[in-house]
């Protein structure tokens, strides 16, 4: 973990991501992360469903030109139904925002989540109770 950036998200939001991933399983899910960056922390405060997203077996796609011009978007989250929480080259090539969060099957705990920067370096995740 060469980057000292920490990503924080509430347990409630993380549970919402897990629930969405479980409902679409075995298809991938994709959401936008809204929040704020301050010093060494990105705090995720909301989830946004992207317009015209397509959820498929082994992929999730959306027209990036349709994303809202909203500077409060700090990144994206998507699921890997295989359980592998490492980013693929496609994931990194379609990086949007400051962070990429990946949730993997069985979508049950913080052990099924990883967060990365645009270089593919893993970031620290803090799950809060707020």
Task: Please state what every model-predicted region is.
Residues 1-73, 81-130:
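Conserved beta-strand-loop surface patch within small alpha/beta domains used
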Residues 76:
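Conserved, mostly hydrophobic/aromatic
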């Amino acid at each position: 973990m060469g980057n000292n950036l920490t990503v924080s998200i509430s347990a409630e939001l993380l549970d919402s991501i897990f629930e969405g991933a479980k409902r679409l399983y075995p298809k991938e899910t994709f959401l936008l992360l809204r929040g704020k960056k301050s010093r060494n922390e990105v705090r995720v405060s909301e989830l946004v469903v992207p317009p015209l997203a397509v959820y498929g077996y082994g992929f999730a796609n959306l027209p990036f030109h349709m994303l809202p011009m909203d500077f409060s978007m700090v990144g994206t989250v998507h699921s890997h139904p295989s359980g592998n929480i490492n980013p693929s080259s496609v994931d990194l090539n379609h990086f949007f925002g400051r962070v990429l969060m990946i949730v993997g099957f069985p979508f049950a705990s913080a052990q099924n989540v990883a967060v990365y920067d645009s270089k593919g370096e893993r970031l620290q995740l803090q799950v809060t109770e707020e």
